[in-house]
């Protein structure tokens, strides 16, 4: 018997049964326990969700911006009131430590909704004078029905990130969470309904990539916001364009460089590197997995990193003291272990971890020890490809120009960071790095006010920040003639 029972679709302000007759299972990655059976959406269900969203969107867009703002603020209040309950669910579904989900996942998701609730009333057009008796004005109008496709590493946070600007601008959204972590998006739907969001404005359809493809290719979807891998992102972009030239926002993979210069505070640098590789068991798209360290300090830096890795508390995610949990699934565990074996085979020096943890309460979970490789080269698979797990690669460098060139030698461009006491060098280096999200002497924070997204094959568009709100609107230009019309013929 499952912990949470049968999970249905959420369409039109309530739960409905899928018509496919199919279900899939979701498991607790720490214990292997069956959490729920989830109904898979059919093409007819996707059509129903979009039709419901169209109806709800008309009502939602007809409200004043202040009315929408108040409703979204109420949703924020409900999220914060239920933080502990939602964090417990997210921990069971993802395997993240409860200390992490309590402090980050729902908290930051609510912050983003609050941010856009505040901006809803600031959506404005322009007035452009042409001459004494004629002018142009513009309106920013909602796109209509948007699709959100989430990833498995931050299920409820991603759902908040995608819905907040869309709803603030007067759109509706049909959201498909990852089939690996499908539970918390349904709770967000309940909260939106309770807060007063009209029925249909936020619908949740469940299923695998085929359901995402139905959304992406649907002619009545105006925009797709996708978070996931590069190859899937390319398919999303292709289908979105081929179907109806719909707009896309995509936050894709990364293989981000962290550069530690020779004047860095080594304790600070080691703390940053460990956070940038092992937070959330390394399952973060912006992880700084390519750690470039100046040759003169590499040994001392490496020692400090290893000291900190020994202090990581791997354990049951539900224990308050745990700060490192399992990987999200058996498939992800196999993938990460495969990369570790590749690192060994290509000559990287294993300095810590490198094994699956199977003793005691780890036996049925998807645990891999925090792993550090030294003596890495740029051409190694573990250095070039996204692992999405707790595997750090340490590389040495000698000059600023050299490390910048090597850091940029990738088709990814999501994030980058530098650690140095020389702020001139910090800014100079950051300005030359080909990455959309950069940090100086820190790592990982992505507040609501900060636009996040990638360069190159790490994404298209941005999430969070004022710019994102604008991209959930379309501009209508209107010329007004107050004087005499001069006919052409």
UniProtKB/Swiss-Prot annotation:
Its cofactor is K(+). NAD(+) binds at residues 150-152, 176-179, 229-232, 253, 285, 386. The modification Cysteine sulfenic acid (-SOH) is found at residue 285. One of its GO terms (biological process) is glycine betaine biosynthetic process from choline. Its EC number is 1.2.1.8. It holds the Pfam family Aldedh. It comes from the Bacteria. CDD domains: ALDH_F9_TMBADH (cd07090). It catalyses: betaine aldehyde + NAD(+) + H2O = glycine betaine + NADH + 2 H(+). K(+) 1 binds at residues 26, 93, 180. The record marks 247 as: Seems to be a necessary countercharge to the potassium cations. PROSITE patterns: ALDEHYDE_DEHYDR_CYS (PS00070), ALDEHYDE_DEHYDR_GLU (PS00687). One of its GO terms (molecular function) is betaine-aldehyde dehydrogenase (NAD+) activity. K(+) 2 binds at residues 245, 456, 459. It is an enzyme of class 1 (oxidoreductase). The active site is at 162 (charge relay system), 251 (proton acceptor), 285 (nucleophile), 463 (charge relay system). SUPFAM superfamilies: ALDH-like. Binds 2 potassium ions per subunit. Dimer of dimers. Belongs to the aldehyde dehydrogenase family. Involved in the biosynthesis of the osmoprotectant glycine betaine. Catalyzes the irreversible oxidation of betaine aldehyde to the corresponding acid. PANTHER family: ALDEHYDE DEHYDROGENASE-RELATED (PTHR11699). This is Betaine aldehyde dehydrogenase.
